[in-house]
């Protein structure tokens, strides 16, 4: 059985915790898109971790963790991440990397940095991890697959050709030193040795695993609103963040995905530029940011303070719809216990008309939030294990959101720890 875990919002919804929890009953966990540009924060008996490339199931001995063909594979980053968790007492995980995964090159990171500098105030707020240049090359058919590392003659020829092309941009657009093709070739040979133990025909491996009845988790990165087709374009990421892409980025038939667990945050947060209708500011935002997450709302990759907002039912319902959500996991509910009342954005006012449908970016920029207010529960809910033991106003908040999302909320996270979860 294949289950996807994806985000309904801007990312940072708490997918890592939900994956870590569900991995206990799973055999295989797969990252199918994105790269090291976003982090999944996990707190368990080994400590606190922010994983960027490794799937969130690496903390269990019985699981196999897979980097799928849809991932932007930063090989030295992967090696470092494995070393980091092992140094903290985590048993070395069983990792496989698709032989069809493409390599995030050193120059992808440079181009990402230089382009943000060139754009200045018009920049996209990139994490500068090389993601957009990587996917640009992948779809321009000038990327490097892992399998290409093993034909040195062809690899060297390709490096020379690519460097000639890239150096035009490097020298004439960005006015930076040219890429040395010999140095790059040697770097790729080093990458080969780092990744060699993990390489596998992942689609064949998964085909056999499905036939054997294995439990498989597809772990998504970021959320619906960052999808390049269905998100707030152009303030999006460069790979699809939807569960539907899990079939492509892992190499399985789409009909095998039986369950789509969509993770939704009990309030809103975002990193980077772009429209954010329910955003709040000043002391109100600072207080929510300070209390939020598992030690404050700051980007797991960049450390940047996240933009904060009230729960946006319009955006979240849309996010669940385009993910094809079969169930919702509602996270960070415990953070809101200090508030006497809670605002929920239930509609957008655009040019004097109210809509409950999520619009395209041009219209979204004009949207003003339409709020409804619910009473808070004004107490701590961590440690509660049963839904019926939650304060009445807390349950009303959950049930109001569930009705707005039009999708059942089956899990409620009431703390950052692995076991701080309430099932409904």
Describe each region flagged by the PLM.
Residues 1-424:
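Non-transmembrane, aqueous-exposed alpha-helical and coiled segments at domain scale
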